[in-house]
Curated annotation (Swiss-Prot):
Compartments (UniProt record): Cytoplasm
Boundaries of every J domain copy: 5-70
SMART domains, sorted: DnaJ (SM00271)
Functional description taken from the UniProt entry: Participates actively in the response to hyperosmotic and heat shock by preventing the aggregation of stress-denatured proteins and by disaggregating proteins, also in an autonomous, DnaK-independent fashion. Unfolded proteins bind initially to DnaJ; upon interaction with the DnaJ-bound protein, DnaK hydrolyzes its bound ATP, resulting in the formation of a stable complex. GrpE releases ADP from DnaK; ATP binding to DnaK triggers the release of the substrate protein, thus completing the reaction cycle.
Family: Belongs to the DnaJ family.
Species: Ehrlichia chaffeensis (strain ATCC CRL-10679 / Arkansas)
Names of the cofactor(s): Zn(2+)
Protein name, per record: Chaperone protein DnaJ
Molecular function in Gene Ontology: ATP binding; heat shock protein binding; unfolded protein binding; zinc ion binding
Main location: cytoplasm
Entry text on domains: The J domain is necessary and sufficient to stimulate DnaK ATPase activity. Zinc center 1 plays an important role in the autonomous, DnaK-independent chaperone activity of DnaJ. Zinc center 2 is essential for interaction with DnaK and for DnaJ activity.
ZnF locations on chain (CR-type): 137-215
Amino acid sequence: MSKSDYYDLLGVSKSATPEEIKKAYRKMALKYHPDKNPGNKEAEEKFKELSEAYDVLIDQDKRAAYDKYGHNAFDSSGRGGFDFNSGFSGDFSDIFNDLFGGGFRGGRGSSRRHDSGAVGSDLRFDIEITLEDSFNGKKVPISYVTYVKCSSCSGSGSEGSAKSVQCSTCHGVGNVRTQQGFFTIERTCHVCNGEGEIIQNKCKKCSGSGRVRDEVNLLVTIPKGIESGNKIRLNGKGEAGYRGARSGDLYVYSNIQKHKFFTRNGSDLYCNVPIKMTLAALGGHIEMPSIDGTWTKVKVPEGSQNGDKLRLKEKGMPIINSSKRGDMYIQITVETPVKLTKKQKELLQKFDDEPNVDCNPQSTGFFQKVKSFWKDIRSN
């Protein structure tokens, strides 16, 4: 049976760089790895072919021989006579350690029972608080259900003083290997489930796992100035580990409710304040509430325009891990009078008839530009 072209197997061109070859192999190997396809002989064979192709193409000398002689390069009876076995260890854990940083289990002599698989999972909890809670800080009670250490066996999984014995199938390693040609396939030991040990007398409460599901109640301290999306890490408050292994962590994510008055950007607060046309024109003062519960007298400059911003220093939110605060910005919205009486209309008309071009410089200047533009068009 003829072999598939190594480049076609990995889906790369003959000019592919080592990085492109490594990336392509990573993608394909993850798809066909035996651990992801238990009992699938077709996937197992595909994985062998992919690994063989990678081992050749990633090596400069082997690749050169393959490009020149094809598959005959690795057949002692062929023209190239390149000894494939001389450069291949037959243990794919080396390849995967190189590609995935040791992410695949089963390095030589490694013990499954000590790897990260037994560690409890991290958990996430979302809380919703008010802007005032974020300003003042708060202690929030939370409750959730997860795996906790078994109180009967203290997490050991054993009943009473019973001890664990070494698994006779994997000899305490936690995984077993089978040789197929010059390929080594490594799988988790099915007898001890990768623990390397077997409990002779399992705890009745937790069935030997060392953990049970229960409700956890905590009081979480919310720091001053926390923002939406910030997370608080509580070490060891996640899921309990398997048979006394380290517990995961709990991450509490905050979500700040929408405020009826303020909007927030980092440590700064913003609010839109409508004011009368007369106040904007003549100037004056307004009373403004702050997030800290106090009131501040704010000066509105004479001739204030719609959209102008007034800044109140250090009237915003606390800055985390600092004694300082952000600022508060007041954006002015000049309100046009509506439902005027006859007298009010007459007064406004009288005001508008006053020959003072300086009181509305923007609109006066704009319409002068319009007249000039129109005059130029007509003259052309």
